[in-house]
């Protein structure tokens, strides 16, 4: 697991209040991890802070799974 992947999973676990072991790449935030729309907004903000990136709303709407969050962070991370 890459450093970015581990950091993304840690943020997701913290933001959604689930165990890190439950945060696997194929999990969807809403369907599998119980997130609501506010949770997803807060999750995107946490990812932006952690990786010093800006995620436009139209992109944020597409980040619906753990793997998509990891992929986005890997391709846009500055830190």
Swiss-Prot record:
GO terms for molecular function: acyl binding; acyl carrier activity; phosphopantetheine binding. Keywords: Cytoplasm, Fatty acid biosynthesis, Fatty acid metabolism, Lipid biosynthesis, Lipid metabolism, Phosphopantetheine, Phosphoprotein. GO terms for biological process: lipid A biosynthetic process. The keyword rRNA-binding does not apply. Its main location: cytoplasm. 4'-phosphopantetheine is transferred from CoA to a specific serine of apo-ACP by AcpS. This modification is essential for activity because fatty acids are bound in thioester linkage to the sulfhydryl of the prosthetic group. GO terms for cellular component: cytosol; membrane. Residues 2-77 form the Carrier domain. It is found in: Cytoplasm. It holds the Pfam family PP-binding. Belongs to the acyl carrier protein (ACP) family. NCBIfam families: acyl_carrier (TIGR00517), PRK00982.1-2 (NF002148), PRK00982.1-3 (NF002149), PRK00982.1-4 (NF002150), PRK00982.1-5 (NF002151). This is Acyl carrier protein.
């Amino acid at each position: 697991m890459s450093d970015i992947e581990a950091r993304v999973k840690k943020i997701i676990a913290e933001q959604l209040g689930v165990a890190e072991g439950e945060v696997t790449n194929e999990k969807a935030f809403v369907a599998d991890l119980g997130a609501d729309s506010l949770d997803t907004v807060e999750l995107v903000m946490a990812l932006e802070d952690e990786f010093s990136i800006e995620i436009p709303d139209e992109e944020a709407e597409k980040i619906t799974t753990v793997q998509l969050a990891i992929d986005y962070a890997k391709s846009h991370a500055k830190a």
